[in-house]
Amino acid sequence: MIAMPLHRALLKNFLGYAPDWYKLTIFGFLLINPLLFYFVSPFWAGWLLVVEFIFTLGMALKCYPLQPGGLLALQAILIGMTSPQQVWHEVTGNIEVLMLLVFMVAGIYFMKQLLLFVFTKLLLRIHSKPLLSLAFCMAAAFLSAFLDALTVIAVIISVAIGFYGIYHRFASQQGEDEADISDDSALNGEEHHRTLDQFRAFLRSLMMHAGVGTALGGVMTMVGEPQNLIIAKSAGWDFVDFFLRMSPVTVPVFICGILTCVLVERFKLFGYGVNLPDNVRRVLEDYDRDMTEKRTQQDKVRLLVQAVIGVWLIIALAFHLAEVGLIGLSVIIMATTFCGVTEEHAIGKAFQDAMPFTALLTVFFAIVAVIIDQQLFSPIIHYVLQSSDSAQLTQFYLFNGLLSSISDNVFVGSVYINEARNAFESGKISLPQFELLAVAINTGTNLPSVATPNGQAAFLFLLTSSLAPLIRLSYGRMVIMALPYTIVMTLVGLLCVEFTLVPFTDFLMNNHWISLPNLTISGSHA
């Protein structure tokens, strides 16, 4: 066996299974950045770094962004674009967000049985496809307003994979141990192939409705998305304040999103409108009946306990009884205690999904530190702040929407709220205008970002899941199926920012439903 040359072995190990062109591109970035920083302009080197980082987010299907983005961030610190102290300042300033990801996501993991039970009953009890789609969309929206969207999508993916596997094993006449549900060669007859294709289309539409539902619900509350918490902290809002502040935009968008769900199903547009095949329903109902009969008293108690913990979670968040991460920790403690999960390795599994994204979010903050130190967004913010107050809202919404549709909305939201806070602290905008800009930034990062899987973490999670190849859900198909929602949510959001945000906020203020927070000019910001 001929030994592999050292340089070839290094390239092979570098970024693992990412394609060679991608590896060489990252190498090129790492080579160009210090040259541009030292010999041309720190400002333009900083902007190139931001573009490079957005590129790594956009190429998330080629390689998880933590490694290439982390290398770029490390190099930026080493060559002096920012300092470890500034990065640490950003991280500590956003510790609530990191706590949310670590503890809340893990906490909801221990409530999966209840969520699986709910979505299973929805799928089997509701026979009308438009009504079922509406139920999935609204259930995902409600859950995402209080829980982590990734966890909600993960649960629905689990339901879909489970049901797909049940029918696939039935159609291929294989046992649970021997079946490979990704292999269709064992299917018996053309009818089973046709039925399975129809079932795939049915599951695709349900998953997309649920994914959009997480965006519709997630934009409404401060815990719905990680960037919401960053924005809420910067603006000085609690849970109820955040909901009321967003409502002039989010409530009309929610209503129009729900109408879109019904219309695309009713008129069978953009790949929607496919019904659950009758023979698949019979197989799934038989399986559910069998599982219900096997459910023990202990299993029933676990479901009841998880439902009670869910009520505690909603009350604790609504009344801000503690920081979000601590509420998540309380969920972990209660759910594991009363559901009998006491082994360390079993508890450890709950943290697996959140930790990579938590690490990536810390890298985001390093890039934000570069943006602050190099004042990269100052020209853009200066340009926007030359406009009238209403034009500022529209421009912030559109700038956020455009970037969020191609990049990660947590990163975009963090950057823009930071710049808006800086403008307020330097006296360029008033406190009421800053509060309105925070609404425009939050809705801008959350609503148009459904356009592509790059923008919404839940969409990216769905696309990279083991379910996507089973139901033939590709990147292009996701973009097409998201298109009606993208158009409606973006345009309705824009119109609301333009016409309803200011008068309705004034109405809430005059009736003492909301008030201006006591923000200190010298306070730390997100």
Curated annotation (Swiss-Prot):
The keyword Zinc does not apply. The keyword Cell inner membrane applies. The chain crosses the membrane at residues 14-34, 35-55, 99-119, 122-142, 146-166, 206-226, 239-259, 307-327, 328-348, 357-377, 397-417, 451-471, 479-499. It is a multi-pass membrane protein. InterPro entries: Na+/H+_antiporter_NhaB (IPR004671). Na(+)/H(+) antiporter that extrudes sodium in exchange for external protons. This is Na(+)/H(+) antiporter NhaB. The lineage of its organism: Bacteria, Pseudomonadati, Pseudomonadota, Gammaproteobacteria, Enterobacterales.
